[in-house]
Amino acid sequence: MRGGAHGPGDRAGRCREHRQDHAGPCAGAGAPFARPAGHAGGRVPARVLRRARPHAAARGTGRHRRRAMASHRGRRAGRSHRAGRHHAADDRGLQRVRVRRPQSLPPGARAPAPLRPHAADRPRPGLAARRPAARRRPGARPGRPLGPRRAGLCRAALFGGLWRRLGAHGSRCGCAAPAAAPARPGGPRARRPAAAWPLPRMPAARMRTSVVRVRGEAPIAMSEPDSSSPPAHPPRPIRSFVLRAGRMGSGQTRALAELGPRFVLPFQREPLDPQTVFGRRAPRVFEIGFGMGDATAQIAAARPDTDFIGCEVHTPGVGALLKQIGERELTNLRIVQHDAVEVLDHMIEPGSLAGIHLFFPDPWHKKKHHKRRLVQPAFVERLVTRLAPGGYLHCATDWQPYAEQMLEVLGAEPALRNSADGYAPRPEYRPLTKFEQRGLRLGHGVWDLVFTKHQGRSASKQCTATSSP
């Protein structure tokens, strides 16, 4: 460490050679800690030494020391207006010393030049200022954050030149604004006609030409989408169910792992072969939405000469029915865990079912959700095509408005015939389900509808909707 003309200085700013306080080269910039302005002689106060102590010489690591000093400066922020700042330099770096500002300087003395503060005391630029200039929004201040770029795309990338020509590129998309065109020598740049603006791309089969008249200009031929042609992609079908997460018991999990490979049929786009699936050819009944499978297992156990295919999307219900299959040792029951509409379209052959069970489907109580109800005219037509002549369709619900809709839709199908005058009594083969027992406890009624597919489609029928007591 270098000092003044007499020798290196100590922590108090005194010359180590003379061991006394004096003004001279020893108190210059070469000393490790120069005596602040306003202290002509004597020892430097201890509080000043504590502020001026180097971080590396402090107890512990420099990171903890800087944190402690930063918190101390925060507590003394209230007195910052009465204190000045003086900087001292040594070979270890730049430190900032907080001393009291003197009222006046001695004659001939000059205030010390301010030095660059320590890195911990320098203000850090904002996040937007540290970002590259290419991602900065035009006209944004350095300290303000940029708007989020959603999904990595912007409006200009989605709509191409049309968005830039409409002058909407100054949004928060984060893209660079298009460069302005150079001014022409003859005058300002003329505006391009509206007919020259590019339009979004669309297949030629779906475009039709129409004439649009713009004020002050000649008629312009523009292309519009043709609503008469079919859309490029088919609309997404409305699902009648919502997958919800449910708990799986240990017995259901074990049954799903042990019996699933044998009794759960994977979805395929080819019709099922009953000889391969059941090992025989017998009447088949298709059940839509068996829930936890209690009623399905009882019906399959009571009718061993009939093969049953249950369709369910919820995994806990599939595991519960597999557990029932293992306990009852059923061999005439299989499960498909998939959407029933797609299963009917691809896995069930037309005219191959002896019966269809639809017990207590989701009623979708709200009016805006009635479109999600399973019993709709289009779905009933699909069911009729899969029924064999003389096959039956058995529906049950505990929601009276839904029962009325079922009776109306099924009665309007010309290929079905009601087996009763209105609602039918509960057949002997159908046991009380969990939903039915809950409805009876709440005082709700239960309505069964049994329709059969007659031999000739030209036969006429009339159904009278009456409520059973």
From Swiss-Prot:
Region (Unknown): 1-221
Pathway connected to this protein: tRNA modification; N(7)-methylguanine-tRNA biosynthesis
Any one of the GO CC terms: tRNA methyltransferase complex
Region (tRNA (guanine-N(7)-)-methyltransferase): 222-469
Keyword Cell membrane listed: no
Pfam family, one: Methyltransf_4
Region: Disordered, residue numbers: 1-150
InterPro entries in the cross-refs: SAM-dependent_MTases_sf, tRNA_(Gua-N-7)_MeTrfase_Trmb, tRNA_methyltr_TrmB_bact
Residues reported in the UniProt entry to bind substrate: K366, D398, T433, K434, F435, E436
Enzyme Commission number: 2.1.1.33
Active site feature: D362
Name by which UniProt lists this protein: tRNA (guanine-N(7)-)-methyltransferase
